[in-house]
């Protein structure tokens, strides 16, 4: 909603007051944090690592390192070609069960390697807030255009 409001605001400005605007919209952001708030993306991975989820939801999403998101911000400030654009920042996409398998292979043996039935995800989403946002996209592939 904030992005939509920003674009709408820009449309109301006369030409003397207009300015360049770029939206950096990252997908699931992972990596080192600057504060104790680990964010939604990292909290889901932490739940996998701790074995707090018996299986993975059939969620397909994009992943990007937080440092690459920072680089995208710098890039957009230094390159006029990004002016007045909406940039989706994603390194790769995969199903969440693949993340669980990668973690398991990396030594996090509590991480689930099986996919949870969609009906069960919907029940868990009532109690686990991080899952509430994925119920509408269960089983759907999400592929992002990584070109500028």
What label would you give each PLM region?
Residues 23, 57-70, 86, 93-96:
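Conserved loop-to-helix N-cap of the C-terminal "lid" that shapes the substrate pocket in Rossmann-like
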Residues 72-136:
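Mid/C-terminal beta-alpha module of Rossmann-like enzyme folds, strongest
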Residues 96, 136-148:
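Active-site loop of classical SDR/Rossmann-like NAD(P)-dependent oxidoreductases
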Residues 1-21:
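Active-site Tyr-X1-5-Lys
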Residues 29, 33-36, 40-64, 68:
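A conserved pocket-lining segment of Rossmann-fold NAD(P)-dependent short-chain dehydrogenase/reductase
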Residues 26-31, 93:
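Glycine-rich beta-alpha junction loops
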Residues 15-19, 31-44, 76-87:
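Glycine/proline-rich active-site loop of Rossmann-fold NAD(P)-dependent oxidoreductases
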């Amino acid at each position: 909603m904030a992005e939509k409001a920003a674009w709408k605001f820009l449309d109301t400005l006369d030409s003397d007051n207009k300015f360049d605007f770029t939206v950096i919209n990252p997908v699931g952001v992972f990596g080192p944090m600057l504060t104790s708030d680990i964010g939604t993306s990292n909290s889901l991975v932490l739940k996998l690592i701790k074995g707090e989820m018996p299986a993975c939801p059939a969620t397909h999403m994009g992943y990007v390192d937080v440092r690459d998101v920072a680089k995208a911000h710098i890039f957009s400030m230094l390159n006029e070609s990004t002016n007045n654009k909406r940039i989706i920042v994603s390194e790769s996409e995969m199903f969440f069960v693949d993340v669980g398998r990668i973690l398991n292979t990396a030594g996090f043996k509590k991480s689930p390697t099986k996919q949870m039935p969609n009906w069960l995800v919907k029940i868990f989403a009532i109690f686990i807030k991080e899952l509430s946002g994925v119920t509408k996209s269960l089983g759907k592939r999400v592929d992002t255009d990584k070109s500028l």
